[in-house]
């Protein structure tokens, strides 16, 4: 899955005009069946909402108002009650920033969502395509709208402290200013229609899956805080809190987290959470080691801690540590930039390096998940080809979930299944809806990006199949993507290498054809946590230069190719170390440093009729055949009493030759 996902409407199909050829050396036209499709996404009339928001902006003396995507914990994934940017703009993708002035409104998003946003935004909105030449960033557009000493407002809990300071400085140079508006203005527009905050119970995540007790994790964190000579750590990221305390929740769809804050000092551990979410089991689990405090008291307590620190030791007192992703509001409550040390979270770094129990769990859950995918694709092919069943994209996704749910330790999906036929696959974060989605066409490419939560790990896998006869052009595109995926999987690199440096390996074969994809190549994956997990990843984001790949990291490997209105191709395998990023033996050790590589754990066959063997090198062909042999070895026992699926698996894992 590609760096964030959020439910969105639609997938109505309508006719389109002529196809546009891909710039391959030997182009072919796409099949007529593929050319029939197009996405017709709903738009929301935002005129009334914008009018009400502008009225509130006048009342609060704000000329420009910023509406981020994130919640007060800077979550990539949010609960329905925090979907403010979607409500005000109508755009339902997971990433983007809305900016509203008294006369204009703009939505900035990245390349994953250009297609979707262009269809969902109504005529009130200007789409700012992030990263496109001569298109302003949302900060630049905001600064332009604020010229002449105007005031820009934002909810200070929804923007990071570094982001707020950077924007404030840019505005100051332009004669304008940034203010924090404590009452969220979009919430006022939303009114009683805004969904209620979740109130789900929290549950204990057993140590046998976590690999460490929460007491051990807090001890390790305190050692880190002592080394940094800080007064304590104020934690706001939800997955970090869940990981630290070995707890899981259900407050955000597909992500087993819960709304909470925490403060860890050398002698205390405070968890800020609504007490109604605690069960007797959770209370017993935390015992006397953790003090429970009301969720809403975090800001008052942070201010009190900051004041007490200054009174005890004055300005020379040790500062509190705060993640550089924490909110502006939380930073201000601790006294602001001069009184806190903002840094990459030490919990994020620790969480990204899985221990032996977590790595074992990731291996095991991916084998079970692979068995589910094998059963699903065998069933799907039989329904579409042999039985001629009419299945829509949602029917198929529901069947996959039902198959997964039969497996041990299943705890739900890790994101909305992207079940997409034909050109719907070109919408990178496509989400079908019953009643408006497409009927799966066996003569078109079918892309399925899906994942599950298991108590022993989190999965994320994409497979692209064609149940008919793919065109030469489709096979070439698929094989170029496959070559890039193999290049990452087979990479050997010195310790200290970043995901930024590895990214070119996945793109090189597409680049030679003048092609590319507008998303990252890989992201970190949590252990029964968020399917997107920092700080590691493989891609062109600058932050991927900050943290090198290390043994114990679990990372996805998912290059792709998409042609709007035609098809999408993506192949994804989860990588990790020691299993997944692991130390490898090399003939030489230049610089006397360790060398690393990857071990794949995803166990699902690659669509063999989409592979063009003549485009693969001998080593790449061997990789495919070895991988398929490994899948057979690790999964065929699941189908001892299912001869149909076993036969399908045997066919799909047979060696390929040129």
Curated annotation (Swiss-Prot):
One Pfam family from the record: Creatinase_N_2
Cofactor(s) for this UniProt protein: Mn(2+)
A GO CC term assigned to this protein in UniProt: cytoplasm
Keyword Protease: yes
GO MF, any single term: metalloaminopeptidase activity
Sequence intervals crossing the membrane: none
Catalytic activity annotation: Release of any N-terminal amino acid, including proline, that is linked to proline, even from a dipeptide or tripeptide
Residues holding Mn(2+) 1: 460, 558, 572
Sequence positions that bind Mn(2+) 2: 449, 460, 572
SUPFAM superfamilies named in the record: Creatinase/aminopeptidase, Creatinase/prolidase N-terminal domain
Keywords on record: Aminopeptidase, Hydrolase, Manganese, Metal-binding, Metalloprotease, Protease
InterPro entries for this protein: Creatin/AminoP/Spt16_N, Creatinase/aminopeptidase-like, Creatinase_N, Pept_M24, Pept_M24B, Peptidase_M24_C, Peptidase_M24B_aminopep-P_CS, X-Pro_aminopeptidase_P
Superkingdom of the organism of origin: Eukaryota
Enzyme Commission code(s) on record: 3.4.11.9
EC class: hydrolase
Gene3D superfamilies: Creatinase/methionine aminopeptidase superfamily (3.90.230.10), Creatinase/prolidase N-terminal domain (3.40.350.10)
Cofactor binding note from Swiss-Prot or TrEMBL: Binds 2 manganese ions per subunit.
GO annotation, biological process: proteolysis
Family listed: Belongs to the peptidase M24B family.
Function recorded in the entry: Catalyzes the removal of a penultimate prolyl residue from the N-termini of peptides.
Protein name according to UniProt: Probable Xaa-Pro aminopeptidase P
Gene name in the database record: ampp
């Amino acid at each position: 899955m590609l760096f964030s996902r959020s439910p969105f409407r639609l997938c109505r199909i309508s006719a389109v005009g002529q196809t546009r050829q891909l710039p391959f050396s030997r182009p072919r036209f796409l099949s007529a069946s593929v050319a029939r499709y197009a996405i017709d996404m709903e738009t929301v009339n935002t005129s009334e909402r914008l009018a009400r928001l502008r009225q509130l902006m006048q009342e609060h003396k704000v000329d420009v108002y910023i509406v981020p995507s994130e919640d007060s914990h800077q979550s990539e994934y949010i609960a329905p009650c925090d979907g403010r940017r979607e409500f005000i703009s109508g755009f339902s993708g997971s990433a983007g920033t809305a900016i509203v002035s008294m006369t204009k409104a703009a939505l900035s998003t990245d390349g994953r969502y250009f297609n979707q946003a262009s269809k969902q935004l109504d005529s009130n909105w200007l789409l700012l395509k992030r990263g496109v030449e001569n298109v302003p960033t949302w900060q630049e557009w905001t600064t332009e709208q604020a010229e002449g000493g105007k005031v820009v407002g934002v909810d200070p809990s929804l923007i990071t402290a570094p982001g707020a300071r950077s924007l404030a400085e840019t505005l100051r140079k332009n004669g304008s200013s940034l203010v924090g508006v404590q009452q969220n203005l979009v919430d006022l527009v939303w009114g009683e229609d805004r969904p209620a905050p979740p109130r789900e119970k929290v549950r204990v995540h057993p140590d046998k899956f976590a690999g460490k007790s929460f007491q051990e994790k807090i001890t390790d964190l305190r050692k880190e805080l002592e080394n940094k000579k800080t007064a304590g750590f104020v934690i706001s990221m939800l997955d970090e809190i869940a990981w630290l305390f070995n707890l899981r929740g259900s407050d955000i769809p597909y992500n087993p987290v819960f709304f909470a804050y925490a403060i860890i000092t050398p002698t205390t551990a405070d968890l800020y959470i609504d007490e109604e979410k605690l069960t007797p089991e959770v209370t017993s689990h935390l015992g006397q080691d953790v003090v429970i405090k009301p969720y809403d008291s975090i800001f008052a307590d942070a201010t009190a801690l900051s004041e007490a620190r200054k009174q005890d030791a004055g300005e020379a007192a040790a500062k509190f540590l705060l993640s550089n992703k924490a909110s502006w509001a939380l930073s201000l409550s601790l006294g602001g930039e001069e009184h806190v040390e903002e840094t990459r979270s030490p919990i994020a770094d620790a969480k990204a390096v899985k221990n032996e129990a977590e790595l074992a769990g990731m291996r095991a859950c991916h084998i079970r998940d692979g068995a589910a995918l094998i059963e699903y694709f065998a069933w799907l092919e039989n329904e579409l080809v042999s039985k001629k069943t009419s299945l829509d994209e949602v029917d198929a996704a529901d069947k996959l979930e039902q198959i997964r749910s039969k497996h041990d330790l299943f705890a739900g999906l890790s994101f909305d299944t992207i079940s997409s036929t034909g050109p719907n696959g070109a919408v990178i974060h496509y989400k079908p809806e019953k009643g408006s989605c497409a009927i799966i066409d066996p003569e078109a490419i079918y892309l399925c990006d899906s994942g599950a939560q298991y108590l022993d790990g989190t999965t994320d896998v994409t497979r692209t199949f064609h149940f008919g006869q793919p065109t030469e052009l489709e096979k070439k595109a698929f094989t170029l993507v496959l070559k890039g995926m193999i290049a990452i999987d087979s990479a050997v690199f010195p310790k200290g290498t970043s995901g930024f440096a590895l990214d070119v390996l996945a793109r090189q074969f597409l680049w030679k054809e003048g092609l590319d994809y507008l998303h990252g190549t890989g992201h970190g994956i949590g252990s029964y946590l968020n399917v997107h997990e920092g700080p590691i990843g493989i891609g062109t984001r600058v932050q991927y230069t900050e943290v090198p790949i290390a043994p114990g990291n679990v990372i996805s490997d998912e290059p792709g190719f998409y042609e709007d209105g035609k098809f999408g191709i993506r192949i994804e395998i989860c990588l990790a170390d020691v299993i997944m990023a692991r130390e490898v033996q090399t003939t030489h050790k230049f610089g006397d440093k360790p060398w690393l590589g990857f071990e794949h754990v995803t166990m699902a066959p690659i669509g063999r009729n989409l592979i063009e063997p003549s485009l693969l090198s001998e080593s790449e062909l061997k990789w495919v055949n070895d991988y398929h042999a490994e899948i057979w070895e690790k999964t065929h026992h699941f189908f001892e009493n299912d001869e149909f699926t076993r036969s399908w698996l045997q066919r799909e894992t047979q060696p390929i030759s040129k």
